[in-house]
Swiss-Prot record:
Annotated spans, Disordered: 1-102, 193-228, 254-299
Recorded GO CC terms: nucleus
Pfam families named among the record's database cross-references: zf-C2H2_8
Bias (Basic and acidic residues) ranges: 203-215
Residues passing through the membrane, by range: none
GTP-binding in keyword set: no
Keyword Transmembrane helix included in the entry's annotation: no
Full protein name: Zinc finger protein 414
Biased composition (Polar residues): 1-20, 70-80, 268-285
Function in brief: May be involved in transcriptional regulation.
Amino acid sequence: MEELSGPSSDTLATVESSSNEPDKEVASPDVAATATLSSVEEPGPNPTATPPVWDRGGPLQQVACPVPDSCQTSSTTRGVGTNEDLRLPRRRPPPGKQIPCSSPGCSLSFPSVRDLAQHLRTHCPPTQSLEGKLFRCSALSCTESFPSMQELVAHGKLHYKPNRYFKCENCLLRFRTHRSLFKHLHVCIDHGQNPAPPPPPALDKEPPVPERPPESDPSSSLGLPFPLLEPFTSAPTGPFLPYLNPAPFGLSPPRLRPFLAATPGPPTSSTAIWKKSQGATSSPRRPQGGSDAPSGACR
């Protein structure tokens, strides 16, 4: 009866433990929520320790990674490798960088390109003539002299005009440019070293016209008053008349007389006939009533 009157200590312990279990199960979601909040609010690595992305040459916008611990290393390596390869080259040097002079023997450096350009002018001064030195013109029959090379070049344009030419000293041929003259000199020198080719054969001269024998001269045999002219054997008519009997040697008969004066004359018989006919025609008139009058004449 005493055992039933009051619960034992063991039963009380079991009841308390069973009553506390729902409380623990109810409180477990709260603990999980606080754990997730703490994990989200847990700060990552110090942002000041990692330089911003634009300093490493990447884009200006930065996207937060959902898992900062896992993608921290990948973002740094990715920004250094690919972004630097794809970006445009920088025209302006970063602040604090000095640009060295590229002239040999000069170790100066400048913060900007403008300062470097002004410094380079000291290494490349404009061309100036020496004091007291005169530049003379090299053209023939020209005695002009100038204090600077620029004036001499401007003066040289007066001698060498666009229609200038270059002459070969061997064959006296003229060329427009030096290159064409040099090409010709190779050919001209080769021809000068080789023996000259034989001259081309002269044109065949026209065979001399054979002289007619004296016996075949019809004028001498007929006793014509003009032995130098060829008589026409017939009287041809038509448009071919001037082509049938052309003058010998292509000259008119009056112009042939000095050339044919040295030719042998006709035989003695024809000469006698010529003199006889000439004497008969050119005999002087006899006076009328003279002693030489014919016997049958009227007195």
